Amino acid sequence: MGNEFRVCDDCQATNIKTLVPKLKKVDSCATIEVGCQSYCGPGRKKSFAFVNNRPVAAPTEDELIVKIEAKLNK
């Protein structure tokens, strides 16, 4: 089973136009779902994505990508 990324297109700290291409670089075969994730509180302040149904958040997109890569390499 492949990886799954879920991101919100409505949260203030998430920029879909830049985040989705970065996620594709991390895993080009992963499923990426864009839509509300009901994670509005943290999503107002931090970039986040759900990686295989687990939330991962960081102050910046670049830090988020580093955390996601670390999570997938475990």
Swiss-Prot record:
Belongs to the UPF0741 family. HAMAP family: UPF0741. It comes from the Bacteria. It comes from Bacillus cereus (strain ATCC 14579 / DSM 31 / CCUG 7414 / JCM 2152 / NBRC 15305 / NCIMB 9373 / NCTC 2599 / NRRL B-3711). This is UPF0741 protein BC_5384.
